[in-house]
Amino acid sequence: MRITVSGLPGSGTTSLSRYLSERYGFTMISAGEVFRQCAKEHNMELAEFGRLAEKDPAYDKMIDARQKEIAEKSDNIIVEGRLSGWMVENADLKIWLFAPISCRLDRIVFRDQIADVETAKAITLEREHCEAIRYQQYYSIDINDHSVYHLILNSEHWGVDDLGKIVAAAIDQLKKTPFAAS
């Protein structure tokens, strides 16, 4: 089974992906963690690295192509990333997580150890803007078009365990009634 988990920064995609990976024993690959690691390796903030990637498509395309290649050759995998629902066309379940910006910013401040919410907001909004432009330019993908997703969940009011249970119900149903991935 191939599952994609996508969403904007701070929506909980990495947490949910880890949960599902552990629950089902699936391999997990994460574009966000790869991107953050690359930014760190270049001694750059995320927004700064995003601007670099905006100027040189090789950064995004390398990460996206690698994720797609691994996913298409693997069974029982969770692919986490903003574009994974678009890139892994043969996924059995495509999930989009969302949450209000205030909720996402609180999570980002905690996760990335950013000094305050206003700084996190500036960084996050710039990152989202840069990414939306790149996705449109590189792949003709509108990140706000959720039509490829099978399951769209608001992560604001549920912790990862509760979200995991909702998704597990969908996975269990898919296991009972196999169908061709769309």
Curated annotation (Swiss-Prot):
Pfam families assigned to the protein according to its UniProt record, in alphabetical order: Cytidylate_kin2 (PF13189)
One BP annotation, GO: pyrimidine nucleotide metabolic process
Enzyme class: transferase
Catalytic reaction annotation: CMP + ATP = CDP + ADP; dCMP + ATP = dCDP + ADP
Cellular compartment(s): Cytoplasm
Keyword Cytoplasm included in the entry's annotation: yes
A GO term, aspect molecular function: ATP binding
Sites where the protein binds ATP: 7-15
Family to which the UniProt record says this protein belongs: Belongs to the cytidylate kinase family. Type 2 subfamily.
Record's protein name: Cytidylate kinase
Source organism of the structure: Methanoregula boonei (strain DSM 21154 / JCM 14090 / 6A8)
